[in-house]
Structure formats: C-alpha cells, structure tokens
Amino acid sequence: MRIAFYAPLKPPDHPNPSGDRRIAKLLVQALQLAGHDITLASRLRTRDASGNLLRQAKIADLGQRLAARLLGRYARSGEKPDVWLTYHLYYKAPDWIGPIMSAALGIPYVVVEASYAPKRAGGAWDLGHRAVETAVRAATTVICLNPN
C-alpha cells in the first residue's frame, strides 16, 4: 500500500532529535517492514508556540497552498497514495494538509495520536483547535498510542 506520511509537529527526518521525531521514524519503519511504500508527503511544521493568530493563519494558508501543489503533482504523475497518515496533531500543530488531500483524492485519512482539548476553544490557539476538530471528524481512523 502507498502511504503518504505527514507529521506536522516534526518530520521523521528532522535534524534535531526529539521523542516526537523518534516515534515518527519508528512508525515509518514499522510500516515499511510491513511491506508498505511510505512517502514523506511534507516537511511543513505547523507548530505555533506563542498563540499568534496571524502566524497561525499564515501557516494555515501555507498548508492549503501546499495541498493544492501536492494535488497537482499527483495529477501529473497519475499516481496517488492509497491512504494519508498524519502523526500527532494538536492545537499548537494542526494538520492543514491531510484532510484536504484525503477528501480531494478520495482516500482514507488516518490520524495517529490526536490531541483534542475542548478547553482550547476560543483561546489563543482557537484556529488550531478548530483545525484539529475538523481533522478528527474527517479521519477514517484515529489511532491512539498513548491512552492518557
């Protein structure tokens, strides 16, 4: 199966080590060992640590433009992924690409490790909070690695 993999917090090939990067790498390796063809769909990091609405809006716009570009690339190549998989989205680092891609391509949207906190509604990260809610609602499947 061809899987488009995306980690909005930190891509698996990011030069700075972190637990998030490690888990992303392990997910990719596990899927490859299972025989799947994994493509890193994007390296766009969507995290806004400061709660800056203007920055969040710019990141959202960038994600939407990147999705349009990726759709064009898939159309030109004649090949598309069988599934879109996003690892770890939360209100400070939402997925602005995956829901667009899966809807446009008619493929499943799988989320691994989604954090949705209703208390974030209306706050400094409301835009990201609403994006996570949209992504979780659009997801075909949500896989929870950490039950806490």
How would you describe each model-predicted region?
Residues 1-45, 137:
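N-terminal subdomain of nucleotide-sugar transferases
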Residues 34, 101-105, 138:
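Helix C-cap/helix->beta junction micro-motif
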Residues 55-75:
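Glycine-rich, highly charged phosphate/nucleotide-binding loops
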Residues 72-94, 107-110, 142:
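Short N-terminal targeting/anchoring amphipathic segment
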Residues 76-77, 101, 134-135:
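Structural alpha-helical scaffold elements that stabilize or flank donor/cofactor-binding regions
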Residues 96-100, 131:
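A short acidic, amphipathic alpha-helical/loop segment
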Residues 113-140:
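A conserved, positively charged/aromatic
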Residues 138-148:
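A short, active-site helix/loop in glycosyltransferases that binds the activated sugar's phosphate group
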